[in-house]
Design a protein with these regions (language model features):
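Conserved HGGG/HGGXW glycine-rich cap/lid loop of the alpha/beta-hydrolase fold
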Residues: 46-96
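Flexible "cap/lid" subdomain of the alpha/beta-hydrolase fold that forms the substrate-access gate
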Residues: 8-37, 48, 58, 71, ...
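Extracellular beta-strand ligand-recognition surfaces/modules
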Residues: 1-8
Length: 269
């Protein structure tokens, strides 16, 4: 089912007005002064929640599954907000963005929706930072507006389309099975309750941070995104995501830009 979040009032950016979204207290405590919180409606009823802070050269930071734009909150604290405009959207289905039926979670849809954010913010150039699903979705969105990308910081992610049958992890293999996946991720326990277990440092996701990511999803009544996005991960040449991954791979291979790869060596996935 489609769950449409509701904001309050408007927020004015240089490129126009957007629907403001005052953060609830449990989320507001994680952001520094000067943050903007607003929605970009990428198609009727589908709103992408955006956190933004700073002014200057745009940096587009995209998270993965099952977190949100808040993933980059500590990164932002280390960056010069007087010289950088830091834009942190949340993927549709997660955080405070709209929730959608599981069937609408496709790589092509997420690419198109995130590209719409770039277009509506009227960005003309940017540096991109991506992690997990934010890697291919972000690069896929940029492949639709290839003139924008001037540099990239790549975290734990990947852009290669699979050429043979293989699963990313044992968990990804298990959740592909209908009903089994639902029982594992949605019924027996919430994916957010286990989030600390798939970190190199489990202490990096204490209970309050798990709540930051999980509460807006669970309270929405539609928590289909985490499982749907796990099933989006291509496991072979015939997977529904593979065609889009081939486009993304080709785009990334042709890039000639400054890039930095920062990889968490204890990432268990």
């Amino acid at each position: 089912e489609l769950v449409i979040p509701q904001g309050k009032g408007t927020i004015t950016l240089d490129v126009g007005e957007f629907e403001a979204f005052p953060l609830p207290d449990y989320a507001a405590k994680y952001v520094i002064d000067g943050y903007k919180s607003y929605f970009v409606e990428v198609e009727p009823g589908i709103k992408v929640h955006v956190l933004e802070v700073g002014s200057g050269f745009p940096v587009f930071l995209l998270h993965g599954n099952p977190t949100s734009g808040f993933l980059y909150r500590k990164v932002v604290e280390q960056l010069p907000t007087d010289r950088l405009r830091l834009i942190m959207p949340t993927l549709v289905g997660l955080g405070f963005s709209s929730k959608i039926p599981a069937s609408r979670h496709t790589l092509e849809n997420h690419m198109r929706w995130m590209n719409s954010v770039l277009v509506q913010l009227k960005l003309t150039e940017l540096v991109y930072m991506g992690q997990d699903w934010g890697g291919p979705i972000g690069m896929g969105a940029l492949s639709l507006s290839p003139e924008l990308l001037k540099g990239a910081v790549l975290l734990n992610t990947g852009f290669n389309a699979p050429t043979e049958k293989a699963d990313v992890s044992r968990v990804h293999a298990a959740v592909k099975t209908p009903i089994v996946g639902e029982l594992m991720i949605e019924v027996f326990t919430s994916v957010f309750e286990r989030l600390h277990r798939v970190q190199g440092d489990p202490d990096s996701i204490p209970t309050d941070v798990a709540e930051l990511y999980g509460r807006p999803v669970l309270e929405s009544g539609n928590s289909k995104a985490p499982l749907a996005m796990m099933r989006m991960v291509p496991d072979g040449p015939d997977h529904p995501s593979t065609a889009a991954m081939r486009i993304i791979e080709k785009y990334v291979q042709a890039l000639d830009i400054p890039a930095e790869i920062v990889w968490g060596m204890k990432d268990p996935i």
